[in-house]
Amino acid sequence: MVAVSSASHYFDADPSAPERRRTVRTRLAGRDVEVQTANGIFSPDGLDKGTAALFSAVPAPPARGRFLDVGAGWEPIALTLALRSPEAEVTAVEVNDRSLQLTRDNAAALGLDNLVALRPEDVPEDAEFDLIWSNPPIRIGKPALHALLERWLPRLAPGGEAWLVVQKNLGADSLLPWIGRMLEERAPGRFTAERADSVKGFRILRVVRAR
């Protein structure tokens, strides 16, 4: 995770510092693209190491389905999913208003009409997802992180998969068994959770819901 000032954090709903946008050139879904980033969000300088590790480890997304990205700044994950699977419905969930608007603007600039960026409360309660990719905001603290995962991981549709990237030294190895216990309590016998890979100090975690 990047360092942020004490006055405004990337997980605040409304960052207090005035917005300063800039254009960053990066590579998403095998394409060189230009995206808008800004201060007061996660990883404003471009693609962070954790998300890059996730991209290197996950299998290609299905061509169709309902996909979810939970909280990752200017949403390189959601943009990548929408670019790679143009017939899929991609939802980016964020609490940071600046990130939400950047995601919408970047999606529009890239012609991605299959991507919507929403606050958590605007996602229908009965919505389920075939695929979740996420670099969850570990620095929000354990209680808030657990609440976030409890809210979204059970939303996997039957046969769906979630892929998470968590830095090893930020608690990945203790988070995995907690995820397994939480899902077993919520839906006994329906979910499995495993460490799928390790990439440059990051754990890639995989959650699967049975069909």
For each feature predicted by the language model, list its residue ranges.
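Conserved beta-strand signature within the Rossmann-like core of class I S-adenosyl-L-methionine
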Residues: G159-V166
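Core SAM-dependent methyltransferase catalytic element
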Residues: R195-R211
